[in-house]
Amino acid sequence: IECAGWSEDIASVDRETARECVCVDFTVPEAFRANYKFIAENFKAAVIGTTGWYDIREEVSDYFRKCGTPMIWASNYSVGVNVLSAAVDIASRLLAKAGGYAPYIVEKHHCHKLDAPSGTAKTLSACVDANMGLHTDVASVRVGELAGIHTVGFEGSCDRLTFEHEAFSRQGFAEGAVVAAGMADEIAEKAAAGENVELVNDFKDLFLGL
């Protein structure tokens, strides 16, 4: 995979080049909401790391399918975070059956991060809420230059179960996005060859084979 270029104005991208490229979007919600139709109409495929647009996820997904453009989305492309997410999914289902456990999440990031809670914390809490039928308390901390720490706990009367992921740098997020770009390109090739493939996918489901 090679970087074909970058732009602060996506409409300035050469459209012939775009048709052979996977768009990797890590911007802000307002920008993605304004640009997703252009991305779907002009790029070979897309990897979306921007969060804060999930209220229109069905609308966006339908548009990408309409355009025949593969899209992979995730709130976090770190391999470790996606394994954490799968583990939390399983644990929350089992603890819901047992009963008597209260979930909580603490997320810590660098002082420059604008959103709180993080997109990853929102994704994790949505999963736990759905599985346990409870509201997950989420606490956010912004301090120093922390790349990111997510802690998910389940507090019971007799014990506590805790899952934690700590990113040492942002490299893991970038590497996961590159993996996703390869997946998106492969889906585009299969679709072009006439294979029946799902065009819109959650990175976690693809990566973990769910």
Describe each PLM feature range:
Residues I1-E16, G99-L210:
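C-terminal substrate-binding/catalytic lobe of Rossmann-fold NAD(P)-dependent oxidoreductases
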Residues E30-E41, G49-R93:
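Rossmann-fold NAD(P)-binding glycine/threonine-rich loop
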Residues I1-E41:
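N-terminal glycine-/serine-/threonine-rich beta1-alpha1-beta2 phosphate-ribose binding loop
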Residues V22, A45, P70:
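Residue-level detector of anion-binding/catalytic polar loops
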Residues F26, G49-T50, G156:
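Short, well-ordered coil/turn residues at beta-beta hairpins
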